[in-house]
């Protein structure tokens, strides 16, 4: 059963649009990590996201792929940048 890893991003004060696009580009580049089926990331276009300005959806082969994805060095590096520049909220569910 596939797993959806959803992430909501809210930039910290002073983080501009160029930095957010750089972050989204780095997230989209994680498709090489084993277990990843697809990655989508973009800017929110509504006022219904509780302050989040950007979102990410990562589709993984299964819930068993999540630990490897989260612990992969490339994901860790992107995660460090995310936490430096954004407030992050994540949710995972099987589909």
Question: Model regions: which residues?
Answer:
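Short S/T/G/P-rich N-terminal loop/turn motif that feeds into the first structured element of a domain
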Residues: 1-53, 61-71, 94-95
